Regions:
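Charged helix-capping and loop-helix junction motifs
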Residues: 43-47, 141-147, 174-179
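Ligand-binding beta-strand-loop-alpha-helix segment within the catalytic cores
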Residues: 84-165
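Conserved mixed alpha/beta catalytic, RNA-binding, or beta-rich assembly cores of soluble enzyme
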Residues: 158-160, 167, 174-179
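Short beta-strand segments
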Residues: 26-30, 71-72, 128-129, 160-162
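Short acidic, glycine/serine/threonine-rich loops at helix termini
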Residues: 37-39, 79-84, 137-140, 171-173
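N-terminal active-site beta-alpha-beta segment that forms phosphate/nucleotide-binding
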Residues: 45-87, 92-104
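N-terminal glycine-/serine-/threonine-rich phosphate-binding loop
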Residues: 2-69
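Short, active-site-adjacent cap segments at secondary-structure transitions
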Residues: 33-35, 75-80, 133-136, 166-168
Length: 179
């Protein structure tokens, strides 16, 4: 898979991508760009996401054979909770299980809000839980369900994978999936 920066190519006005029958473009929407990261309450920057959706739709129209995978960061929906509850510093026990679940719920809320904006723009975005398609081994994250992701892309969906929490075999029992 080749990684392209949609916005850079759009801004520079480049007219073509390398031609490939199954070209995949991975677009990472940074959490600090699509959310008000410093806000105490999690908020999506709707105008920014709507503009990104508009540009993505134009990109797809221009390069219809290119398949897209969207990634998004945690922004104000994840980072403040991870830091507040010190989720990466201590084992998950007792009330910290609730803290972990609350963080995961917040990230799902973010994915649902983003999906709603993309759907209203006519883009067939399918939110996927990153922790369901990724695994960890020796502190390295890897795709564990590549066939499922390939099938979703081949059907014509645009998978949306985002910041997430995952259980691992380490001191804290969990990690942030953010890249």
């Amino acid at each position: 898979m080749k990684k392209h920066n949609l916005l850079q190519r759009t801004i520079k006005g480049e007219n073509s991508l390398p031609s490939a029958k199954n070209q995949i473009t991975i677009l990472k929407l940074g959490g600090s760009i699509i959310t008000e990261k410093l806000n105490r309450q999690p908020r999506i920057r709707k105008a920014v996401v709507k503009q990104l959706a508009k540009e993505l739709k134009l990109f797809i129209k221009r390069f219809p054979k290119t398949r897209i995978i969207l990634l998004h960061g945690a922004g104000s929906f994840g980072h403040p909770l991870v830091y507040r509850y010190k989720l990466l510093e201590r084992p998950l026990t007792g009330s910290r299980l609730l803290n972990f679940s609350e963080t995961v719920r917040s990230m799902r809320q973010m994915a649902n809000l983003l999906t709603g904006i993309f759907l209203s723009s006519g883009l067939p975005v399918l939110p996927l839980q990153a922790s369901a398609v990724l695994n960890e081994k020796n502190s390295v994250m890897f795709l564990s369900n590549l066939n499922q992701l390939k099938q979703i892309i081949d059907i014509g969906f645009i998978p949306l994978l985002g910041g997430d929490m995952s259980l691992i075999k380490k001191k804290s029992n969990c990690c942030c999936i953010s890249r």
